[in-house]
């Protein structure tokens, strides 16, 4: 069995909205392993993105716990949490969040520079990752000079350049047309296999979700395997 990266145990999340106590997630159990792909689908407002934020340590559960590489995220100080997250997790969102004043290469270098790599090391690793996503020839172009699909490829390269254990993606193809969405997903799945990275993707697109090894449905704050899905 492949390495266990993330584990949710009885995870729940509540928010206060005025005088109301709103239950968003309850009783969630989930394991994410290296090299496995998981799609999470559900209606808008069902809690998909909230779960992804909790998996990534960007938010904490109201009950239960999340283990990242065996460490309970609730027990960590902010410095240790940030270090663990930066070392083991990559994030991709619907909007690419590339810095417009920098080239594709410089954007992909950024996580490595933040991690104290030298510019030479960062540039070499970033260029290698841009080559993997088919953007080596566009490395000197700024975000505004790239197409929508190219910008999302650059964002994925940036998320993977630190070689994280798991990539968490929130609607990564949501701003793309159908052809580009398929191409980007193909690339993510290929890199998942090549790098042995766990992949968790939140999407509203049932067709794209069907490409993953496991599909989970978020409904009424609970997570269930999709009937008839692979897994």
Swiss-Prot record:
InterPro entries listed in its UniProt record: AAA+_ATPase, ABC_transporter-like_ATP-bd, ABC_transporter-like_CS, ABC_transpr_LolD-like, LolD_lipo_ATP-bd, MacB-like_ATP-bd, P-loop_NTPase
Keyword Transferase annotated: no
Gene Ontology CC entries for this record: plasma membrane
Domain ABC transporter intervals: 6-231
Keywords (A to Z) from UniProt: ATP-binding, Cell inner membrane, Cell membrane, Membrane, Nucleotide-binding, Translocase, Transport
Record localization: Cell inner membrane
Gene Ontology MF terms in the entry: ATP binding; ATP hydrolysis activity; transmembrane transporter activity
A Pfam family per the record: ABC_tran
Bilayer topology term: Peripheral membrane protein
GO biological process: lipoprotein localization to outer membrane; protein localization to outer membrane
Binding site for ATP: 42-49
EC number(s) on file: 7.6.2.-
Similarity section: Belongs to the ABC transporter superfamily. Lipoprotein translocase (TC 3.A.1.125) family.
Function of the molecule: Part of the ABC transporter complex LolCDE involved in the translocation of mature outer membrane-directed lipoproteins, from the inner membrane to the periplasmic chaperone, LolA. Responsible for the formation of the LolA-lipoprotein complex in an ATP-dependent manner.
Known partners and oligomeric status: The complex is composed of two ATP-binding proteins (LolD) and two transmembrane proteins (LolC and LolE).
Identification of the protein by name: Lipoprotein-releasing system ATP-binding protein LolD
Gene this chain is encoded by: lolD
